[in-house]
Structure formats: C-alpha cells, structure tokens
Amino acid sequence: IARIYLLQKVLNADNAFFTPKIAKLIEVADTGELETFLKFLILLPKPANFKAVAVDALRTNVSTVFNALAYNNPYPSQFFEDSQWNQMFLKTAFMQGDLSAIQAIDKRANKDLARIISDYAHERWAAGREIDPFFWRPVTNFINASLLKDMQRLLNSSNNLENKAAALCCYYSIKPDAKDLLKDHHILVQQIENNELTWETLKEK
C-alpha cells in the first residue's frame, strides 16, 4: 500500500514524466510487487495510462498475478475493450477460477461472449465434462435460438445448480422466449422473486 501511495504522489506531481518510468519499473517488478500494482491500479491518477500493463497481465501463466487483475478489481470493467474483458472472463473459466469474483459481469456481457460461452459449453458436454453454472451469467440478455436450447437443457438437467443458473438467466433476460421457458418451473421463479435465489447465493447449500 505504501508503494501505491508513493506512486500516487509522483504521478500527481508530474504524470507525463513519471508514467513511462513507472511502466518500465513494472516490467522488472517481482511477482508480489506486480500483484499489488494490479490490485490497486484503479487508485492511480489517470489509470487508463497503464492499460497496457493490465492487458499484458491477461497473458501471464502465474495464477496469483492473473487473479490480482481479475478478482474483485474494478479496473477491467472500466477500461478493457470487449475482446479483452471476454479474454479475462474466459481464461478465468478455463483456469477453473472463481467467476463470481469478477466485477460488473452483467454490465460487460456482450453478444460475442454469449456465443463463445455456448460453443464452449457444447464442447464440454461432448467431452462429458461439467461446466461451472456461473459461467452462464453473461448470456442473460443474448439468448438466441441456440442459447434457448442450452437453457432448456440446463432446466431439464439433473444438476440442481444448472437448473438454478438457467432460471436466473431466463428470469432476468430481456428476451420473452427465454422467460417463457420458466412457465413450468414455478418453484425456481418463486425462489428468485423471494430473493432466495440470486447469482450471489447460487452455490449456497
């Protein structure tokens, strides 16, 4: 934290002069220093100037560095382009990370990500592998004909968490066809309306 405070001071003193110098320092920072920088990047003056550093962190193979950027961090949702944000969300899923720790999922959800989620789910199903139910959250407002079939499959699944995830997607969707899928799932709808079932409580027993 002390280092972040120092960076704030020097950047406020002369942002144009110190920004490239700090970027160079970050390139040679050790893992712990880089994690701290990424976690508190949003607190720096003109944080957009360090976007290249944040984007570069998406490519790291060090999970703690990646998680410092992806988890409970407002920076990606505020400054990443869709392709970069999608990459972060998908990599978290591929690494079997905690998708619920990513901020502003509903705000940053987009059509391309929804399509990729469906395609990836089909690959996992074909291989007989499970999918984190939270993975479906970004498709909520992009449920097309293909995703309608995915939602129906999840609602008919023997996995209770998949039922709940699909119910949340369909209930909050702007697509009438998605809402229609819930006509025979009154208990799930009631749980959502009573605020017993939310994305935050999805995995609670």
Protein language model annotation of sequence segments:
Residues 1-205:
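Alpha-helical scaffold domains
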